Amino acid sequence: MVQEKKLRVTLVKSKYGRKPGHRECIEGLGLRRMHQTVEVTDTPANRGMIEKVSYLLMIDEEV
């Protein structure tokens, strides 16, 4: 069985004062507060959201 690749994403800057579309991407990734870390599957949709708000995030790739 092949394991899905995961990405560990941490919100390092505040979502307040950002564009509504950027806030929606942050919420779509499951991030609710500063310095919260979540693991998301490495899919094109998640990669797109991460790329859009990459200036607010710290990303660690996992195997």
From Swiss-Prot:
HAMAP family for the chain: Ribosomal_uL30_B
Keywords: Ribonucleoprotein, Ribosomal protein
Family annotation (CDD domains): Ribosomal_L30 (cd01658)
Family, similarity comment: Belongs to the universal ribosomal protein uL30 family.
Keyword Transit peptide among record annotations: no
Molecular function in Gene Ontology: structural constituent of ribosome
Top-level division of the source organism's lineage: Bacteria
Protein name (database record): Large ribosomal subunit protein uL30
A UniProt-annotated Pfam family: Ribosomal_L30
Subunit annotation: Part of the 50S ribosomal subunit.
One GO term describing the cellular component: cytosolic large ribosomal subunit
GO BP, sorted A to Z: translation
